[in-house]
Amino acid sequence: MSNFDIRTLAISKTGEVPVRNASGEKQYDADGKPLSITVHSPGTKAFNAAQHARQLRNSDRMVNKMQGKADGKQTAEDATEERAEFLTAITISFNNFGIDGQTGRAMFASVYGDLELGHIADDVEKFVGDRANFIRPSTSN
């Protein structure tokens, strides 16, 4: 029997996504604090539930499409809204920034649903799609 505990390879429960402009440059507030977004990792129940809800919507749409129902089609607006819903569900906080005085889920949905801020949603989706972004820091030297 090995002494290696495989759980030491588990990913963190959260990750911090740096906010970048459309050119890929990290952004900071007026005091020099970095803008970031804290998200649930793919190794959490919250992420799993959000992903499952997204997959159910897609499955329902496919069934409706196969049955010739009108609600089997996804518009561009639907796609944007559904992506915003998923990202909102996996977001814990926006750090050092906001929009229009909003807070919580309304703020998250507002940013993720704004096509002019689409690069932020793109970055968050890309970040959570790579489990390596959630690797725990090593405790050994």
Stretches found by the model and what they are:
Residues 50-57, 90, 114, 127:
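Residues that form generic nucleotide/phosphate-binding pockets
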Residues 1-10, 75, 93, 104:
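Short, solvent-exposed coil/turn linker segments
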Residues 35-36, 66-74, 107-112:
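Charged, low-complexity surface segments at secondary-structure and domain boundaries
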Residues 1-65, 134-141:
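Short, charged/polar N-terminal "headpieces" of proteins
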Residues 94-141:
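C-terminal charged interaction modules
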Residues 55-93, 97:
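Negatively charged, Asp/Glu-rich surface segments that serve as flexible interaction/assembly modules
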Residues 5, 78-82, 130-135:
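Noncatalytic linker/hinge segments flanking ATPase motor cores
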